[in-house]
Amino acid sequence: MKKISVSLSGHQTSISLENEFFDLLKKYATESKTSVANIIKTIDENRNPNSNLSSEIRIWILKQLLKTSK
C-alpha cells in the first residue's frame, strides 16, 4: 500500500492505493505526458462528491485497462 499526497483545489489530500494501482497510474501519466497529480485532479473533478477518491482512481484505472484490452 502506498500513500501519496496531492493538492486538490488548494487542499492537501492523502490517497492510499495498492502499489499495483499506483504503478499503473504512473504508467498512464507517462503515456499521456502528464503528471499523476493531473490525472488525480481530473478524476476528482469528475467524480460524485459522495464517492471515495481512492476508489474512483481504481475504477478509472480499471476502465483504462478495459479500453486497452478491446
Task: Label every PLM stretch briefly.
Residues 1-16:
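Short Lys/Arg-rich basic patches
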Residues 16, 35, 52, 56:
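Amphipathic alpha-helical recognition patches that constitute DNA-binding helices
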Residues 14, 20, 31-45:
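Amphipathic, hydrophobic secondary-structure cores in small proteins
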Residues 4, 47-48:
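Membrane-interacting alpha-helical segments
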Residues 48-70:
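C-terminal structural segments of small proteins and small subunits
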